[in-house]
Amino acid sequence: MKKIKHSFFRIFKNIVTLFPKLGINRKTFGAGRVYDFFYKLFWPYKKAIEIQGSKMLIDSKNTPPEILKTFETYAENLVHEKATTELFKKIVKNGDMVVDLGANIGYFTLLAAKLVGSSGKVFAFEPEPRNYSYLVKNIKLNNYNQASAFQKAVSDKKGKTKLYICDYDTGHHTINKPTGIEAYSRGRAVLEKSIDIETITLDDFFKGKEESIDVTKMDVEGAEALTLAGMDNILRKNKKLKMFIEFFPLLIEKMGSSSEEFINKLLKDYKFSIFVIPEDYNAKIEKLREINTVEEIMNLCKGKEYHINLFLERKWE
């Protein structure tokens, strides 16, 4: 039965790939609801699946397809962003304090919690309510008492803002205000639907503990420059900090910030060494190539249209 469901699911997904060629999308009358119905009907995976040593929970009957799509990626590959995952496992140590910014449903939060063990700490920030609910459930499912989740966005100031909800992928919610439907470089569509969320700064949250953080993971869909501004004290005081950043220049620019200034600040003001994590990177046998100029990074992003994953280590004289 399991193999049959997987077969139907693959056939369904293959058929759906033909829709754009026929001029059909989620906005076509009734297409979105029909797609969601069959997506759930053919959903082949268990309620919980083990990924990278931790269990992730999902309830296909009561879960929006956009969250199921995130889980589908994990279930199919048993890994998310393989190269970054392998490096993350190499960098994070037992007893570390890890901060996960843009935690989604908890992939890197769970991985970090497993790596740091009971003597470590993980702080996960996720503002979107449905993502946050699964983040909390997944932490509890694994009895990771060392991990704590907070339904807040990180920014340059404490307050409230709008979070715009992506209509097909829970990893692309953003505080970028869209005009109508925004089409990003890979065909993303962001609806005008928004919710009010709370924002905090990391400097306020970790006041007095700036030097305790070992690793941060940042995936904040364009709010990187704002997040950086809100953790200035941490960056100036913490000599051991290591960072994983998903860098997408186009989204940073849409927030009114300069992607070039963002990289320059990391290189010159905070004296980080910046390394690009290639998709085919093997953490066990390869060394990362250091990137020394803004121009090199922008070239890899192909004129700001693509994102890349970066690893940063502190460089002190």
Predicted regions and their residues:
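Conserved beta-strand signature within the Rossmann-like core of class I S-adenosyl-L-methionine
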Residues: 239-247
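Core alpha/beta nucleotide-donor-binding catalytic domains of modification enzymes
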Residues: 136-168
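Short internal loop-to-helix segment that lines adenine-nucleotide cofactor pockets
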Residues: 75-97, 144, 160-162, 177-238, ...
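Conserved Class I S-adenosyl-L-methionine
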Residues: 259-273
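Active-site flanking residues adjacent to catalytic metal/cofactor-binding acidic residues
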Residues: 99, 125, 216-218, 245-246
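Short, conserved loop/helix-junction motifs that constitute active-site signature segments
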Residues: 112-117, 231-239, 266-269
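S-adenosyl-L-methionine
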Residues: 1-138, 142-145, 187-191, 206-211, ...
